[in-house]
Amino acid sequence: MDVNPTLLFLKVPAQNAISTTFPYTGDPPYSHGTGTGYTMDTVNRTHQYSERGKWTTNTETGAPQLNPIDGPLPEDNEPTGYAQTDCVLEAMAFLEKSHPGIFENSCLETMEVVQQTRVDKLTQGRQTFDWTLNRNQPAATALANTIEVFRLNGLTASESGRLIDFLKDVMESMDKEEMEIVTHFQRKRRVRDNMTKKMVTQRTIGKKKQKLNKRSYIIRALTLNTMTKDAERGKLKRRAIATPGMQIRGFVYFVETLARSICEKLEQSGLPVGGNEKKAKLANVVRKMMTNSQDTELSFTITGDNTKWNENQNPRMFLAMITYITRNQPEWFRNVLSIAPIMFSNKMARLGKGYMFESKNMKLRTQIPAEMLSGIDLRYFNDSTRKKIEKIRPLLIDGAASLSPGMMMGMFNMLSTVLGVSILNLGQKEYTKTAYWWDGLQSSDDFALIVNALNHEGIQAGVDRFYRTCKLLGINMSKKKSYINRTGTFEFTSFFYRYGFVANFSMELPSFGVSGINESADMSIGVTVIKNNMINNDLGPATAQMALQLFIKDYRYTYRCHRGDTQIQTRRSFEIKKLWDQTHSKAGLLVSDGGPNLYNIRNLHIPEVCLKWELMDKDYQGRLCNPLNPFVSHKEIESVNNAVVMPSHGPAKTMEYDAVATTHSWVPKRNRSILNTSQRGILEDEQMYQKCCNLFEKFFPSSSYRRPVGISSMVEAMVSRARIDARIDFESGRIKKEDFAEIMKICSTIEDLRRQK
């Protein structure tokens, strides 16, 4: 089905074609090798922006630290991180004046959250720096390891299950003279293989205990591991992102909860909302500025870009903001919230894996770990790397660089948005006290500024004043990358505004196509993506119909399930033809079994199994939806599943789709190669957690999910639940007396075993 692309644009206004200029087709670029170089760039740049600050030495770790706060005022347009404390505090005061009670109310909301949040909040999130093993781990494993090591050292507050109690353990751990940790190691030995009589290397994995003194422990607790950000489109160079450890995560979560609560109450904030809600918020601000610019006034909009937002922000400034925001709150609450910025102003950036060297004839490869960079002879490196290493050397301690100024990517998005909005707030006429005034939108480091004035000179003066105000707060608007237009045309967080928002369809392109989960989920996700784009992104009926046909084609090629009456030969075609011939009602076969496609743009909301159920042969229904079918390892499927789709910018988002459990909902098995590596012990731990959690969910299904209250272990909670359920089932006659007795006996046995342990 070939389509002439020009046909798509016959009736499209020029500005709607913006999406064709976006770099979103094809695969995004991924990084390979180590992120060490990118991390060194970040550390060096951050220090360069703040170079005229004051140097001090951290008393606990001995790390040199640069403090640019209240540094010299800028004399040129170069980006700097010299935020002025009094200016930040004043901006906060004005923000509160414009929104009476905003900080007070947000603090009360946050206090409630702090008291109710459970430790398992920290299991969300992907990679986390596991300080016990000195490498990245899935969040759940890293948390479990941390709690296990805390328990070894007599820190058991977290057993209450509240996050705030876990944080008490973290605080106490910092005061301990030494911490004992359990770490993994591997032994290699050469043994003779009985079968082949050859020598082979055998690896065994062990756990060993190790003691860390106070200094080493604190360094690890303050360490952020770094990785390269993958799949970033439209950039020539890669950049580093940070993965913090478990000690920092909980504190950051509470600060961000407070900041999120404030952002929700600010009309200029592009966070935490998204999608259509965000567009509505933006449209409101634009409408306000347009209606208020009377016939005599001009209105211009800057599509803004800030230079190195993260590297010029400063945790000390965030501490000042939090101190102000929480000034009338209880002492304990102020302390909890001030710890995250304090930890960040003493942070260490781990340099990653180090460098890989190859000899000229490619015979020898060797890895130089980051720990060795402080002492190695620099003649082996090329010029640019040599300069980087020389610059960073004074900051190195055990393969991590002291990085006091700057915020690593993505850490305090909400709080930095509050800072940005506080400047937009200063643009009201009553504050500018002159003929020009401004308003705008802020979402993390992205902003749009709308300036109104009587003439062009006034507009220029307004922009200049905004620019200088930003400088005082450590924000550097880029004059090269920001551009100004008559209000009505601008871009903000990749939303294009042209008298209303233009659908930027190319952004959704990466999520079209076959996801590769399994036949059942892929069909469902594919049609849901098309449905969602018809609702949200101006995907017209003709294009949607075409997208659907292309998707079905793609799906059939992926799973080799061409129609039973096709001429295409694949590995599956023999079986599919056989099924086709013996099926009475061919329309009832799923597409993945060689059936016809019954989807059109009117019925995309119906799962395929439901769409075809009435058309299926009885025996086909029986095979398709049979939980006892031996060829399928079933996971229990909720009625709604979540798929991860890749939008063009921002993190992968989850998308709900309807899931009907059939024999096509298989789950692929884990790759075996991991079982021979040092990760094996970790994998076993992970499977154990998985099993425990699954078991727990069986006892407390989400429909009746009330958290077991009080300090009871998972086992105690499950045993007591089993007893209650058994009694109810017995009394209502659902189970026999013998079954009831057996359940009670098993429960007692479990309790006895626990006591003996």
Curated annotation (Swiss-Prot):
Subcellular location: Host nucleus; Host cytoplasm
Coiled coil stretches, renumbered: none
Enzyme Commission numbers on file: 2.7.7.48
Keyword Acetylation found: no
InterPro entries reported for this sequence: RNA-dir_pol_NSvirus, RNA_pol_PB1_influenza
UniProt-annotated stretches for the region Promoter-binding site: 249-256
UniProt record similarity statement: Belongs to the influenza viruses polymerase PB1 family.
Description of how the protein assembles with itself and partners: Influenza RNA polymerase is composed of three subunits: PB1, PB2 and PA. Interacts (via N-terminus) with PA (via C-terminus). Interacts (via C-terminus) with PB2 (via N-terminus); this interaction is essential for transcription initiation. Interacts (via C-terminus) with human PKP2 (via N-terminus); the interaction competitively inhibits the interaction between the RNA polymerase subunits PB1 and PB2.
Name the record gives this protein: RNA-directed RNA polymerase catalytic subunit
